[in-house]
Amino acid sequence: LEVTTSRPAIGRGEFLFVSCFSNLGFANGKGDIIDLKTNRICEFKGIRSTLSGDNKAFKQMNKSLIYSVFSLFETGGEYDHFNRDCAAQLDNLLKDQPNLLPKVLERLQNVSEPNMKVSRAFAELYKVKPDLFNVVGAMQLFIYMLVQNASYILLTNNEGFCCYEKPQTPQDAYRIVTELKLSSWQTGDYGMTIGI
């Protein structure tokens, strides 16, 4: 199997899993792999994958997005993407103005049409887990699985794989991202980077 682009529609991992299991096939449209018996979709993420898809539902990280978050606090941020340092500074700002949390989370959703109901649900999670970096990662995972209408997410690297059911609650999504390697939402990317 020759890989013809840097981001092929069907990667080696998908090809391997579909070849090994007779009930799996390639999904049309949303999702990477589908269970042919149940029609349940499994999103497949390889090395350095983002919590985003190839459709227009997802928005790209840029400096103006981060600026809009810091402008809520009437201060300027020195960041051009969302990383752990940026999240830590926002955590400190939120200590003095916790009422801004739902708006911060709304702006850090990686979809072009943010959902305030999702922001409020993850704001409640933040009250229990005051760790903005992982809360935003959990929120992006939760949204990604909703947008893709996927039942599972399967992550692989050169040494193994793991699979999770679609998170049903913010707490489920938080548990998943804390068990994985979550990295920054880089300029130009459409979501935070995740892997095993």
Where do the protein language model's features map onto the residues?
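Acidic-basic catalytic patches of nuclease active cores, encompassing PD-(D/E)XK
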Residues: 1-27
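Low-complexity, compositionally biased segments
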Residues: 17, 35-38, 160
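Intrinsically disordered, compositionally biased, charge-dense segments
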Residues: 24, 41, 161-163, 196
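Catalytic cores of nucleic-acid endonucleases
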Residues: 26, 46-163
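Conserved catalytic cores of phosphodiester-cleaving nucleases, focusing on short active-site segments
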Residues: 33-48
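C-terminal or late-domain output modules
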Residues: 164-196
